[in-house]
Amino acid sequence: MSDLVLTSTEAITQGSQSFATAAKLMPPGIRDDTVMLYAWCRHADDVIDGQALGSRPEAVNDPQARLDGLRADTLAALQGDGPVTPPFAALRAVARRHDFPQAWPMDLIEGFAMDVEARDYRTLDDVLEYSYHVAGIVGVMMARVMGVRDDPVLDRACDLGLAFQLTNIARDVIDDARIGRCYLPGDWLDQAGARVDGPVPSPELYTVILRLLDAAELYYASARVGLADLPPRCAWSIAAALRIYRAIGLRIRKGGPEAYRQRISTSKAAKIGLLGIGGWDVARSRLPGAGVSRQGLWTRPHHA
């Protein structure tokens, strides 16, 4: 294992247990590149949010300067050959090995710019556009590392990122409100007469959260279709990640507003069980007639 892979693996183990668990199922070469890519994505997120690995976001001083530095470092990694820190060296290696369009990593940076600008999200499409920039494009890049070139399959990979981010938004609504952020569609909040305040969601706010989780289900269903086009071990890993993350939404549904009194996550024992179920999901995805149409779903921009 190279020093760069080792450094990236250590960062991911600390920062995302769910990803670290799912990544173990991948073939070694692909696993190394996905870990390096994820390490850069996680580092970029932490820079903007002022987070230590895996901690809650905090309000940060001079977010625009952080964004400008992140953008400059990313471009330096993609365009040059000079020395860069390990997360950016990891991005450089993976992007060149898998022929990423420069627009892909920069789309992620644009998502962080939306945070810095405190963008207002009035509609579900607004939220999905943001979700593409901070998560959907990560799914696209991961799929490319796994050998995917076809746009329809990359769209399914993007759908998984969208589903993950909608689940994130539902889980983190209270924490986000503490630092002045809200990613729930404003028109939904207005329709429900809901406000984002207090230690647990009000009944009105909880109905909006459930509505967002319903939207996530459409993208999880679409993403499952793409499993059939991945190498078997990659498909198993992604199916497991889907199950592990979707379980967060199921906990919110089961626990009601009171679920927010503690960190909502999936236990280690549950993750192990979901790894096995993910294998069955892969098998089902390869059966005739397993496809689900994407008609009506938000679609990512297709860069040349």
UniProtKB/Swiss-Prot annotation:
Cofactor note: ATP is required for the transferase activity but it does not seem to be hydrolyzed during the reaction.
Cofactors that this protein relies on: ATP; Mn(2+); Mg(2+)
Reactions catalysed according to its record: 2 (2E,6E,10E)-geranylgeranyl diphosphate = 15-cis-phytoene + 2 diphosphate
GO BP term, example: carotenoid biosynthetic process
EC class name: transferase
EC code: 2.5.1.32
CDD domains assigned to the protein according to its UniProt record, in alphabetical order: Trans_IPPS_HH (cd00683)
Keyword Chaperone: no
Highest taxon above the source species: Bacteria
Biological function: Involved in the biosynthesis of carotenoids for the production of astaxanthin. Catalyzes the condensation of two molecules of geranylgeranyl diphosphate (GGPP) to give prephytoene diphosphate (PPPP) and the subsequent rearrangement of the cyclopropylcarbinyl intermediate to yield 15-cis phytoene.
Family in the record: Belongs to the phytoene/squalene synthase family.
Protein name: 15-cis-phytoene synthase
UniProt organism field: Paracoccus sp. (strain N81106 / MBIC 01143)
